[in-house]
Amino acid sequence: MKLLHIDTSILGAGSVSRELSALIVERLTRGTQAEVTYRDLAAENLPHLTPATLPSAHPLSAMAGPLDATAQAARAASDRMLEEFIGADTVVVGAPMYNFTIPSQLKAWLDRLAVPGKTFRYGANGPEGLVGGKRVIVAVTRGGFYGRESGAVSAEHAESYLRTILAFMGITEPEFVLAEGLAAGDHNKAQALTSARAAVQQLAA
C-alpha cells in the first residue's frame, strides 16, 4: 500500500489534527509494509496558485511563459505533489478548521491536484472524477461546534468543502474523524479527544 500523509496545522506539536492524522496512519500501517510519503504543508510554505506554480500537466500552465529557476522549482514541486496523490492508494489528511474553512496551505495543495485530464475531466454530462479508487481519511478539528444540532452548520466550510472537492475528483466516500469543541473548555476538549481517538481505532485497517 502506498499511503500519502498530509499535515496542515500551524500548531506543531500542540496540534490535535496532527495527533489524529498520525494515529490514523499508525492504525492503517500497523503490521503492513506500507510505503508512506509525508508532507507538512505548514512547514513547506506552499505558494498560492499562479500559472507558474500549476503542474505542467495543467492546460493553463503554458500561460506562465519561460520560467526562471525559482519558478521551475515551484512547478517541479507541484508536479511531484500531483503524482504523489495520483499514485497513492490511501491519503490521510490532518485538516484543522481556520476561520470557518480549511487552512490556506491545504487549499493551495488541493489547487495543484485539480488538473483536467489527471484527476477529473469534462464529459458529456459534466465533470467526471478520475481518481475514485482512492481511500481518503481526513481528521477535521474545530474549536467550536458546527454540527447539525449546533445551529452553526451553515458556517462550516471545512468538511463540506473537502467533501465537494474530493467528490469532484471521484472520491465520493471519504472518511472523516472529527474532534470539535476543542476551544470550548477543558471538559469538552477531553471528551472530543476521547471520542476522536476511539473513532480512529474503529477505522477499517
UniProtKB/Swiss-Prot annotation:
Keywords recorded for this protein, A-Z: Flavoprotein, FMN, NAD, Oxidoreductase
Record's keyword annotation contains Heme: no
GO molecular function: electron transfer activity; FMN binding; oxidoreductase activity, acting on NAD(P)H as acceptor; oxidoreductase activity, acting on NAD(P)H, quinone or similar compound as acceptor
KW Oxidoreductase (keyword) present: yes
Reactions performed catalytically: 2 a quinone + NADH + H(+) = 2 a 1,4-benzosemiquinone + NAD(+); N,N-dimethyl-1,4-phenylenediamine + anthranilate + 2 NAD(+) = 2-(4-dimethylaminophenyl)diazenylbenzoate + 2 NADH + 2 H(+)
Origin superkingdom: Bacteria
Cofactor note: Binds 1 FMN per subunit.
Cofactor(s) of this protein: FMN
List of residues binding FMN: S9, S15, V16, S17, M97, Y98, N99, F100, T141, R142, G143, G144
EC annotation from Swiss-Prot or TrEMBL: 1.6.5.-, 1.7.1.17
Entries under HAMAP family matching the protein: Azoreductase_type1
Job description of the protein: Quinone reductase that provides resistance to thiol-specific stress caused by electrophilic quinones. Also exhibits azoreductase activity. Catalyzes the reductive cleavage of the azo bond in aromatic azo compounds to the corresponding amines.
Subunit-structure text: Homodimer.
PANTHER family noted in UniProt: FMN-DEPENDENT NADH-AZOREDUCTASE 1, FMN-DEPENDENT NADH:QUINONE OXIDOREDUCTASE
Family membership noted in the UniProt record: Belongs to the azoreductase type 1 family.
Protein name from the UniProt record: FMN-dependent NADH:quinone oxidoreductase
Species per Swiss-Prot/TrEMBL record: Methylobacterium nodulans (strain LMG 21967 / CNCM I-2342 / ORS 2060)
Lineage of producing organism: Bacteria, Pseudomonadati, Pseudomonadota, Alphaproteobacteria, Hyphomicrobiales
